[in-house]
């Protein structure tokens, strides 16, 4: 003020910009004026967006590819997560450029703009999302993502600019915590419910209702693949075992194939399935009792009234905790009745289809029979 009074002789001669430009702006204060740190709002917004882009990934994984969620490997989870980030890289820039927000950010009351309040261009939004993926999420890799998230949290809460924030500002509205919690919980509940529904739908067989032998065979092949029982053998349209041939694949042993099924058919409709296995040896590998399990599931899960809401109940019936391969077992589902009988002569040890004689030099005889039929 003293300088102005000395140097300016009249109000009309005053040029305020000459004096204002001499001040150094406080970058940290400027950042606080734009938006106070809200790390958890940003974190949950990102989580909602990732959950949403995970839905089409789950659709392909379960509905189209019929993957068994109980046997999905950690590597497959990582690949699916990377695909989800890839979708986010495609979709988020479009949403930011068009609306200034995403579904997750909207739930948390966040908009992303340029410092002047204008929306980002597509290229600016794409660059921002790519930097979030690289620096903030560590390319979506386990452990790396955890470390990057922690470091970003520390920088952000100290008021430092994050790698992807240059040229953009996140603005937060004044909505209450209750509203955000409700929207966040609802979003995750919807995503979780849809994902579980798709995983359960993957268990349903391709053919439903009254089955022909060919349709039954297709169901058996479906479940053998679903439960990863090998690709060497499959049932043909006549319900007989056929050895699959693959380029550069040579099989050793087991050339006779699994024990065959026999069928009872009335007016073209499959009414009953029968299976029997017998062998005498000191060591018996692979009785093929899993095929009896798949046969029951192929017939039972096809019945009217079986849906994604109860498919787990019939699948549980064939689990090793319920159906032990060396013991008699019976089950029923809808109008399908099944009986499995196991007769073993001699002292033995059993484990997952493997029989071992406990008497040196003395063989055991294993006889297994299976019958599944539609109730009259």
Where are the predicted features?
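Extracytoplasmic/periplasmic C-terminal soluble domains
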Residues: 311-376
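Membrane-interfacial and juxtamembrane segments of integral membrane proteins
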Residues: 3-291, 305-317, 327, 332, ...
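Surface-exposed amphipathic alpha-helical segments
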Residues: 294-305
């Amino acid at each position: 003020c003293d300088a102005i009074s000395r140097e300016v002789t009249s109000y009309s001669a005053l040029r305020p910009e000459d004096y204002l430009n001499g001040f150094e702006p406080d970058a940290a204060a400027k950042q606080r004026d734009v938006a106070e740190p809200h790390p958890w709002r940003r974190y949950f917004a990102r989580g909602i967006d990732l959950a949403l882009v995970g839905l089409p990934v789950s659709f392909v994984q379960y509905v189209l590819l019929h993957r068994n969620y109980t046997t999905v490997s950690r590597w497959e989870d990582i690949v699916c997560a990377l695909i989800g980030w890839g979708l986010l890289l495609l979709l988020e820039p479009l949403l930011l450029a068009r609306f200034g927000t995403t579904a997750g950010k909207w739930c948390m009351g966040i908009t992303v703009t340029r410092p002047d309040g204008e929306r980002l261009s597509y290229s600016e939004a794409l660059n921002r999302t790519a930097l979030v993926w690289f620096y903030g999420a560590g390319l979506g890799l386990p452990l790396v993502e955890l470390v990057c998230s922690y470091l970003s949290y520390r920088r952000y809460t100290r008021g430092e600019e994050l790698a992807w924030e240059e040229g953009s500002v996140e603005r937060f509205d004044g909505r209450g915590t209750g509203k955000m919690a409700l929207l966040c919980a609802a979003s995750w509940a919807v995503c979780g419910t849809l994902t579980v529904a798709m995983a359960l739908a993957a268990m349903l067989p391709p053919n439903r209702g009254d089955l022909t032998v060919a349709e039954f065979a297709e169901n058996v092949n479906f479940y053998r693949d679903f439960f990863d029982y090998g690709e060497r053998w499959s049932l043909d349209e006549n319900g007989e075992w056929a050895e699959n041939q693959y380029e550069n694949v040579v099989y050793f042993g087991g050339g006779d194939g699994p024990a065959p099924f026999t069928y009872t058919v009335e007016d073209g409709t499959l009414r009953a399935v029968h299976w029997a296995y017998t062998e005498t040896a000191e060591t018996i590998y692979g009785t093929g009792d899993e095929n009896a399990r798949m046969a029951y599931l192929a017939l039972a899960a096809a019945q009217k009234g079986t849906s994604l809401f109860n498919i787990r109940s019939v699948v549980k019936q064939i689990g090793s905790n319920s159906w032990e391969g060396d013991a008699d077992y019976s089950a029923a589902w809808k109008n399908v009745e099944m009986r499995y009988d196991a007769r073993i002569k001699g002292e033995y040890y059993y484990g997952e289809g493997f029989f071992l004689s406990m008497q040196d030099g003395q063989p055991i005889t294993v006889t297994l029979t299976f019958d599944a039929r539609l109730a009259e």
